[in-house]
Amino acid sequence: MVEKGKSRRNEVATREYTINLHRRLHGCTFKKMAPKAVKEIRKFAQKAMGTTDVRLDVKLNKAVWSRGIRSVPRRMRVRISRKRNDEEDAKDELYSIVTVAEVPPEGLTGLGTKIIEEED
């Protein structure tokens, strides 16, 4: 029997994911690729972390746009952190921040979802 109580969605957590942008952008007009990629990353983070407030790091935006509007990277390794919102007038108590994760020299093959332990 599963205990009712605190949901895992209300905890602070950090995870690393590989996002296949090529699959999500298939059939998209060339001149809309990079803006759509940013929207898809935001949508992925909302679904993965269960928060509606998603903030993208500047380095992530630069990585998406690094090869221009048409040539978006096929896959990206991202780190998504769910954090508490300290502002009193915030409508959500949690928000997610998405940053670029380091890609190992071997490439993205075989990397799954990785849970990062916080050092607070």
UniProtKB/Swiss-Prot annotation:
One biological process term in Gene Ontology: cytoplasmic translation
Work out whether the entry's keyword set contains Acetylation. no
**Keywords attached to this entry:** Ribonucleoprotein, Ribosomal protein
Q: InterPro entries per the record?
A: Ribosomal_eL31 (IPR000054), Ribosomal_eL31_CS (IPR020052), Ribosomal_eL31_dom_sf (IPR023621)
What cellular component terms from Gene Ontology apply here?
Answer: cytosolic large ribosomal subunit
Top-level division of the source organism's lineage? Eukaryota
Record-level Gene Ontology MF annotations: structural constituent of ribosome
Q: Looking at the keywords, is Membrane present?
A: no
Family the entry assigns: Belongs to the eukaryotic ribosomal protein eL31 family.
What name appears for this protein in its UniProt entry? Large ribosomal subunit protein eL31
The encoding gene is RPL31
